[in-house]
């Protein structure tokens, strides 16, 4: 799948290319600028239940810039998102809490 964004004058602003797995989930997203130079690449992994478990983000040099790791509860609700830097050091952790009425 390919998606192109244009500026007001009609020139190409950016191009996003997507690769999907057999379930239709995005497993790779690549973004190029208007000159067709790589800006960013994302690779996504899913667990056995089809939930996004990991997202690795690469810069224009194809070196890892950050990684997100996701956790879920037994109901399939996201419970945590951990973000790591280029050297795999934890830089943030976000917990999700759900309340039911």
Language-model features: locations:
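Buried hydrophobic residues that stabilize the cores of well-folded domains
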Residues: 1-101
